[in-house]
Amino acid sequence: MDLFNFDAIKISLASPEKIREWSRGEVKKPETINYRTLKPEKDGLFCEKIFGPTKDWECHCGKYKKVKYKGVVCDKCGVEVTKSKVRRERMGHIELAAPVSHIWYFKGVPSRMGLILDMTPRNLEKVLYFAAYVVIDPGDVPNLEKKQILSEKEYRELKEKYGDRFRAGMGAEAIKELLKEIDLDKLSQELRQELETATGQKKLKIIKRLEVVEAFRKSGNRPEWMILDVIPVIPPELRPMVQLDGGRFATSDLNDLYRRVINRNNRLKKLMELGAPDIIIRNEKRMLQEAVDALIDNGRRGRPVTGPGNRPLKSLSDMLKGKQGRFRQNLLGKRVDYSGRSVIVVGPELKIYQCGLPKEMALELFKPFVMKKLVEKGICNNIKNAKKAVERQRSEVWDILEEVIKDHPVLLNRAPTLHRLGIQAFEPVLVEGRAIRLHPLVCTAYNADFDGDQMAVHVPLSAEAQAEARFLMLSANNLLKPADGKPIVVPTQDMVLGIYYLTLEKKGDKGEGKIFSSEDEALLAYEHKVVGLHARIKVRRTIEKDGEVVSGIVETTPGKIILNQVIPQDLGFVDRSKKENLLKYEIDTLVDKKMLGKIIDRCIKVYGTTRTAEILDEIKELGFRFSTRGAITISVSDMVIPEVKQKLIAEAEQKVENIEKLYRHGLISDEERYEQVISIWNETKDKLTEELIQNLDEFNPIFMMASSGARGSKNQISQLAGMRGLMANPSGKTIEMPIKSNFREGLNVIEFFISTHGARKGLADTALRTADSGYLTRRLVDVAQDIIVREEDCGTEKGIEVSEIRDGTEVIETLEERIIGRYAAKDIINEKTGEVIVKRNELITEEIAKKIVDAGEKSVYVRSVLECKTRYGVCTKCYGLDLGTGQPVNVGEAVGIIAAQAIGEPGTQLTMRTFHTGGIAGQDITQGLPRVEELFEARKPKGVAIISEIEGYVSIKEDKKRTITVRNDNGEERTYEVPYGARLKVNDGDYVKAGDELTEGSINPHDLLRIKGPRGVQSYLLAEVQKVYKMQGVDINDKHIEIIIRQMMKKVKIEDPGDTELLPGDIVEIYRFEEENDRAIAEGKRPALGRRVLLGITKAALSTESFLSAASFQETTRVLTDAAIKGKVDPLIGLKENVIIGKLIPAGTGMAKYRNIIVEEKA
C-alpha cells in the first residue's frame, strides 16, 4: 500500500484486539533507562525489544552490529537489528488488571456512556469511581430494577436478605457488562417508537439518545469498547527522554503519566494474587482508573496531576489541543528548509520584480544548486569538495552563484501575512551587506516600512514550484488587490510628493509665457535654468496619427512635459476623437495620490500588467528625483498660526459664558448646556482650521504633504498650528474643557494631562484590535477554506436581485459597484428602447454596468455564489471575475480563503468602540469590529430591534405601556410591546412589510430568517457587514461576504424525518438532505421535512463534514470524541485536511484535473 496515496481517512474506537494487534509487546515495568549504562531497561517504557534499537543496526547487548545483520533478531537480548527510526512508529501496550473507562466518552458533554445506558452522568461517576453499586441483574428481588444505583449500605442489607439472588457490581467492570448486553438494533427500534408519542423535554432526551445509538449502530463500533482492557503505549521517540548537560534527564510528561499507570496496575495485580480484602482492591482499582484518566486527559475530572513546581502534566489530549498542540503547531504550520530572514531596507534602484538578496544569505540558500554546478563545471571533482568550497566561500563560488540565481525566483514573506499579497515572488539581485532590499512600491501590499521590519525568504525548489512562483506570484503580476480589484501598487509618500511638486504651477515663475519649438527645447531650457519647473509655457507638439503628422501649440509646464513622457498618451483621460484634443497632454492637472491611482488603474486596463509595471518604475524614479530636487522638508517656521486665533477663542469663551449664565438661571438643563458648549468649541476649531488652510501658501511644505496625499491630514495640520480642540475622557465622553493651544505654541500642564487619556486609549485599543481581528480572520478562513472553484458552470437558473445598498438616505454601495464583474442571471433589457443590454450568463463589464445604470434600471438579477449549485465549492459563472487579475476566475482558485482574507485583513482598521446614541435611555449600538463579529457569529445583537412578522398598517397605543399593533386586510394582527427608552421607527398609520423594523436597533438575524426566509437574511447580513466596512472607508467586494454567508446557511434542521435515515433535530448539509429525500421519493417513501438554519461561523466551521478540519480548529477533544463514535470518514475535500496529512492541497495546480495531465513527447 502506498502510504501517501489515499482518498479518505477514517477514525473509530479501537477494540482491545486492535490495540494488541498494533503492539510489539507488553510494557511490564515502569523503569525507563538504566542510570548507570544509560541504556533502556528491558520490559520498561523504552525497552528496545518492544520498540526497536536505539542505535542504527545494533542490538541491545552488542552481539550484532553493522548493516549486514539487517532483520536478525538477537538470540540473547531479543532486539531486532534494524534502523533506529522504527522507535518513532512501533507501539507497545499495557494489559490492565481491571477494566477502566475512557474519560472522553464518560465525561464529555453530553456523556456518551450515560446516554447509551440511560444513566445520569452523576450516577455513572459514582459507579465508575467505586462510590456506589449498580444492579446488573435484579433476579427475583422485589422493587429492584436493572441499572438501579445502590449505596454501600443498601447493597449490604440486600445481600444479607437475598444472598445471591441478584447481581450488582461497581467500577468499570459493571458498566462494561451493562454495555455488552445492549442490543443496538432493538434499542434503536424502541427509541423510534417512543419518539412518536413523546413531547417536550422527554422528546429531546430520546432524540439525543437515538443519535448516539445510531452512531454506534452505523459505525460498527461496540459500546463496550468505551471501556479499556488494554492501553496502547505510544512510540518512545514521540515521548522522548534526553540527557541535559548536568547529567540530569528531561523527559516528556507522558512518561510520568505512563509510569503511574504501570505502577498502580502492577500493585493491583499483586494485591489480587495475594487475595487482599475487597476494600483495598477497590481503592487500588479506583486509583488505576484515575491514573488512566490523567494519561488520556489530565484535569478533565478533579484536580489535575501536577509535576514539579505545581505544573499540570501534559496528557495525550493536551498534545493535540490549542495553538501549541500537534494540529496547529506541527501539522498546519511547519518550519521549512531553504529559508532565511533578515532586516529589510529600501531598494529604490530595483525594478518592481526584483529584490536585493544579501550575498552570504543567497549562498546558503542556494547551496545545493551551487554545489551541483561546481561539480558539473569540473571546478570541484566531487560533492564533498564542492561543499567545502562553498563553506570556505572560495572566489569561484560567487560567479557560480550569480549564474544559479539568474531566473530563479525567491519568495518574500512578511508576518503577519494578512492576505495573499503578504507573500510574493521576486528575482533576486545579489547585494553587499546583510539586509534584504525591498522595492518601495510593494511596501503597501506587505504593509512594510523600514523602521526595523524583518522579512523571510523562501526558495521554491522544483521546476513546477519555480514556474508557479514566476507566473502566479511575481510582484509584477500582482498589481491588484483581491479584496476589491483596485490597484494596490500605487506610489506613496516621497513619490507622491515628487510627482505633486512636478505638476504644480507657479504664477510668475521664471520664463513664464515663453514659447518653444519642441518638448526637447523646453526641457533644455529648464535644465539650463532659463525656465522654472512650474512656469506656464507654450510648446509645439508633433504627433503622428493614422499616417498623417499633426502639429500644434500646447500650453503646459516643463514639469508636466516630464511627467507625460513616461505616461502613455491614450489612457482615455482626454477624448481623442475630438479634433481640438488631439495634441493635448494626457495628464494636464495637478497630480495627487488619488489621481495617480486612477492613472495606474487605467494603465492596467488598457495595457495589462507587464507594461504597467514598467510605467510604475518610471513614475517611481521621477517621484524620488523630484522630491529630492524640490527639497521639500518640514521646519517649525512652516507652521503659520493664523492671526485670528486669539479673536476666535475669545468669542467662543464669551458664548460659553452666556450659556453658563442661562444654565445658572435655570433656563436650560445641564445636558443641553453641555451639548451646546461642545458644539461651540467644535465650530471654533473648524473655523480656525479653515482660516489656517486658507492662510498657507500652496508651496508650504506641510500643505503640500497633506494636499498631495503623501503624509498627514487637515486634522493634523490643525493640531500643529490651529488648536487641538476637545478631548475625550477614558469612558469616551467628551471633556468640555478644550485644549486651546496647538503643538507649535505648546500645551500647558492641564492640557497635556487631558490629552494623555486619548493617547493611552488609542494604544490599548490598537493592541486589543489586532488580536480580535486575527481571531476573526482565523474563524473566517476555517469556515470558508473548502470553497474552491470546481467547475465552469453549475447550470443553475437562479440568481439574486441586487440593488444599491442604502443606510437611510445615504448610499453605501451603488448598483454599479455591485454588478461589475458578475454574470447576468436573466437578459437585461433597456425598458425604453427594448434593446438587450446583456444576455443571460454574460459578463457585466464596467461599460455594460454603466449602460444598465444609464438605462435607469434600479435592480439587476445576477448570478451569485449564494445560489450556486456546485457541491463543495462554487462555479466560475456564479463567482464572476477574479478581482486579483480582472479575468473570469480559474477553476481551482481557492476563493474561500481569498474571501476570508479580504474580510479579515482590514479588520485591524475597524474601530472597537461602542457608540453611545444620544439620550440616557437609548441603547448602545455595536459598531466596528464587534459588530462584524456579531453578524458573522449570528448572535442576538445588543439593543435588538422589534420587527413586524406580517405586513399591514401600524397603530401605536400609548397607555401605561407603549404597544404597536400591525393589522392587515386579512384580519391578521400582531401586537408588540415597546420597552422603555426604545425609539420608534414608524408612525401611526404607516404601512410596513413583513420583516420591517418597528423600533431602532439591530435585527436578530434568526427572526429575520423565520419571517423573510433565506434571501431576506442574506441581503440583511451582506448590507450590514458592508455598512461597517464602508464607514471606515474600506472597500470589499460583495462576493467575498456572500461566500461566508453561503457557508453559514448551508445546513438544514430536520423537523420531521419522514421515512428517511435522518433523525429529527439533526442538522445536515442541504445536499445530503436533498439526496436522502430524492432517494425516499424514488422508493415511494415519505420525504423528510426541514428548515434552513443560520449558523455562526464558529459553529459552521465545527459542523463541517471533515473531522480533521474541525478538530484542528477548536474544541479538539469534543470533535474527535464525536467523530470516533460515529466512525466518521474524512473525504479530504477541503484544504486544511490535506495540509494536515501532508498531501498537495486540492486547489490550483493541486487539483486532480491538473495533476492528471501528462506531457508526452511527440514522435
UniProtKB/Swiss-Prot annotation:
Coiled-coil stretches noted in the UniProt entry, renumbered to this chain: none
Cofactor(s) for this UniProt protein: Mg(2+); Zn(2+)
One biological process term in Gene Ontology: DNA-templated transcription
Molecular function GO terms recorded: DNA binding; DNA-directed RNA polymerase activity; magnesium ion binding; zinc ion binding
Record-listed E.C. numbers: 2.7.7.6
One GO term describing the cellular component: DNA-directed RNA polymerase complex
Catalytic reaction list: RNA(n) + a ribonucleoside 5'-triphosphate = RNA(n+1) + diphosphate
Cofactor note (record): Binds 1 Mg(2+) ion per subunit.
Binding site residues for Zn(2+) 2: 794, 868, 875, 878
Alphabetically ordered keywords of this record: DNA-directed RNA polymerase, Magnesium, Metal-binding, Nucleotidyltransferase, Transcription, Transferase, Zinc
Residues binding Zn(2+) 1: 59, 61, 74, 77
Residues binding Mg(2+): 449, 451, 453
Subunit structure comment from the entry: The RNAP catalytic core consists of 2 alpha, 1 beta, 1 beta' and 1 omega subunit. When a sigma factor is associated with the core the holoenzyme is formed, which can initiate transcription.
PANTHER family (UniProt xref): DNA-DIRECTED RNA POLYMERASE, DNA-DIRECTED RNA POLYMERASE SUBUNIT BETA
Role played: DNA-dependent RNA polymerase catalyzes the transcription of DNA into RNA using the four ribonucleoside triphosphates as substrates.
Family: Belongs to the RNA polymerase beta' chain family.
Protein name stated in the entry: DNA-directed RNA polymerase subunit beta'
Organism field: Caldicellulosiruptor saccharolyticus (strain ATCC 43494 / DSM 8903 / Tp8T 6331)
Gene: rpoC
